[in-house]
A protein has these predicted regions:
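Flexible loop/turn connectors
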Residues: 232-237, 241-321
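Hinge/beta->alpha junction and helix N-cap segments in small-molecule ligand-binding domains
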Residues: 67-75, 95-102, 154-164, 180-226, ...
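N-terminal helix-turn-helix DNA-binding module of bacterial transcription factors
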Residues: 1-60
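Central regulatory/effector-binding core of bacterial HTH transcription factors
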Residues: 86-128
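Short, well-structured alpha-helical segments in soluble
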Residues: 102-115, 220-234
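N-terminal helix-turn-helix/winged-helix DNA-binding helices
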Residues: 2, 41-79, 88, 110-113
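Flexible loop/hinge segments that line or gate small-molecule binding clefts
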Residues: 122-161, 244, 267-278
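Short beta-strand segments enriched in small/hydrophobic residues
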Residues: 17-20, 54-70, 176-185
Length: 321
């Protein structure tokens, strides 16, 4: 394997001079530059990319921590991140976590070792305090409201949309609502806030039997509908965590020739248009784009960008496109 020392020996120049030519750093005469490049071509020498990154202090790689891609939240977020990355010289590395705190800490240690120029946490299992401790090693962007933590963030400002949705339900005398969530309130701030905002409008929390967690896919939604239908035929509405999941709930009732309860979806997917399901559009692709811009812009450290979510009724999702 040809090394930089071989290029230096055959060209007659020092390894440091060859390094300056390879990395385009420091002064090298035109004659010297030409000679060294001729030898590199003759030897078919390919510079070590890792060594070049070390010499420049940058990898041009951004790590994106994703628990999974089974839910539209993550796929839409990733779409926005990739769109933004394609406009830059950075590449994106997907770092699957399944909310495993050990894996997430491993990725933070990789940031500490400069294996990435920055990390985007689309969601997390570890605490915000743990994330904060690693910001001294490189940019970290989270995709949730970090509150008073010194973290850079791009996230959905969802409270007004949720209050509007629950008020709409209450105004229509909807009392029995089933909630579908990915994770329980004990580990998910999104779940906890949703229940809090429901209580703010209704004056009480939903019954525990009407809260179903571990729902991330349409198949999960279908099974959740089956569970509810077998126990309670008085449910008026399902407040779901995805339009595709809402569509799966509907499909169960259709398959069983049962009256279909009302549905509210989330994430502004095509299913909300084709089935005319009210939805909460969080604009996750836009959040992903903002998260990427923040992680590659260290001067924006600790900035918090809120993207307003919208409660969308009457098949108006594509109205302004």
């Amino acid at each position: 394997m040809v090394t930089i020392k071989d290029v230096a020996r055959i060209s007659g120049y020092s390894p440091s001079t060859v390094s300056r030519v390879i990395n385009h750093s420091g002064y090298v005469s035109i004659k010297t530059n030409k000679k060294i490049k001729q030898v590199m071509k003759q030897l078919d020498y390919v510079p070590n990319a890792i060594a070049q990154d070390l010499s420049k202090g940058k990898t041009h790689k951004i790590g994106v921590v994703l628990p999974h891609l089974r839910h539209s939240y993550f796929s839409q977020m990733l779409l926005g991140i990739m769109d933004a990355a394609l406009q830059t010289e950075y590449s994106v590395t997907l770092l699957p976590s399944e909310y495993d705190s050990n894996l997430e800490m491993h990725y933070l240690e990789q940031l500490k070792r400069k294996e990435y120029d920055g990390l985007i946490f689309t969601s997390r299992g570890i605490s915000l305090s743990q994330l904060t401790q690693y910001t001294k090693y490189g940019p970290i962007v989270c995709c949730e409201n970090p509150g008073n933590k010194h973290l850079t963030a791009a996230f959905s400002d969802r409270k007004a949309a949720y209050i509007q949705a629950f008020t709409w339900l209450k105004d229509h005398s909807i009392a029995k609502i089933v909630f579908l969530f990915s994770r329980p309130a004990t580990v998910s701030m999104t779940t906890q806030l949703t229940l809090d905002w429901f209580a703010q409008v209704y004056g009480h929390f939903p019954a525990n039997k009407h809260i179903i967690t571990n729902v991330t896919t349409p198949q999960d939604g279908y099974r959740a509908a089956q569970t509810i239908a077998m126990k309670d035929n008085t449910v008026q509405y399902f407040f779901t965590n995805g339009d595709d999941i809402a569509a799966a709930v509907r499909q169960y009732y259709v398959d069983q020739h049962l009256p279909v309860p009302g549905l509210i979806g989330q994430n502004g997917q095509v299913a909300s248009v084709t089935l005319n399901i009210p939805t909460i559009n969080h604009h996750y692709a836009q959040i992903g784009r903002q998260a990427f811009k923040l992680v590659v812009s260290p001067e924006l450290k600790n900035q918090k960008i809120k993207i307003k979510a919208d409660f969308v009724l009457n098949n108006q999702l594509f109205k302004n496109l």
